[in-house]
Amino acid sequence: RYFAEMNKPVILILNAGGPVELTEILEQTHNIKGILNISQLGQEGGDALADVLLGKEVPSGKLTTTWARHYEDYPSSEEYGYLNGNLEKEEYKEGIFVGYRYFDSFGKKPLFPFGFGLSYTSFEIKCCGLKIEESKIRTEVQVTNTGNKYAGKEVVQIYTTFPRTDFEKEYKRLVGFAKTRLLQPGETQTLIIEIQEKQLASFNEDSHTWIMEKGSYGLMLGNNSDNLEFAAILEVPDYEELEQLDEICPLQEKLDCIHLSEEMQEKLIQYQKEEKLAQVPRYLFKPRCLSTPSEKTNDVEKNNGSLTNEYKKVLSKIAEKSAEELIPLLYGKISENISTLGAAGIRVPGSAGETSGALEECGVPSLVMAAIMAMEQKCVTAVEGI
């Protein structure tokens, strides 16, 4: 408040492990000229931060989650813990609309979109070509540093939109990305980003099948989920089932997930009919069937029978365990009165926890989660993000 009253320019530094609600402070203070999110860099974080602030290093990180304007903008904001009055059970009702998929599909404007991140320089991103090779799409993208002072790196992101049908899908999905090397002012780099056909598929829970529906799939190019331009349209001529799977974890009770309203569906349909799409190049894309569960099993047994036998032995041991013995797999190895940061790890001191050792006698070891010591080794590159 003091700096705002004195009209002093301020750089807001966030040393937090997740999104922070900033809308109110940004609306009330007009002297915040920049925000630097350093995300808990570790003991050398101060040196890395100083290099960025002094211009010795150029930030090139991107947000790996959407930052909402208000906490209430998240779809399950009132569902967790005591907020809905049920302390015994948590239901995750987002379904396919997780993160940016929810904000895009339901028309919620975020404070900072998924994939967002600024630099001290600027870039031009241009699609130079697209080639379909068997079961993948090969895109060629040119990135040019259009600034005149700082070298920098940029992250190219490719998203796909889907044909609007009775089968519910999110509006768009990240299907590929790549980061450039350090580009000097005026320098250009060509990136090749390959998109596997399964990344364009949707999962049918009723038939347990990965499918691609007939229709137009738009490929959008940019540097965050809200700054995109259509680069190509893929025309899929027929409905295709790419992969048939077996159900292994069926729902034990009905789960009511959120769904698009008819009004929102119509808005998404109209958006894909805009005149500007008429100028976008179109390509015919014919996906191919990948495999069935029986084919996968036959391949494994044919190529590595011993592995299959070991796998069956492990499964048989796990099947003998009671539900009470398996429940710790859900919450990991924790102890009362022990901090979850820095002292919760058993195998690696300094780690922030680990999974359960409930299956160690079956040959399945516990896994160490986020380790603070690993942050120290990567503190310099952590400001780069992706």
Language-model segment annotations:
Residues 150-158, 170, 203-206:
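Short, hydrophobic/aromatic beta-strand segments
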Residues 5-10, 30-33:
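A short helix->loop->beta-strand "cap" motif at the edges of active sites that frequently abuts
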Residues 194-225:
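Short, surface-exposed ligand- or partner-binding patches at beta-edge/loop junctions that are enriched
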Residues 15-153, 159, 214, 218-222, ...:
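Secreted, periplasmic, or luminal enzymes acting at the cell surface/secretory milieu
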Residues 301-347, 353-355:
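N-terminal amphipathic, basic-rich helices that act as targeting or association modules
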Residues 166-205:
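Intrinsically disordered, low-complexity Pro/Gly/Ser/Thr-rich segments with frequent PxxP/GP/PP motifs
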Residues 227-232:
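Extracellular and select intracellular beta-sandwich modules with Ser/Thr-enriched
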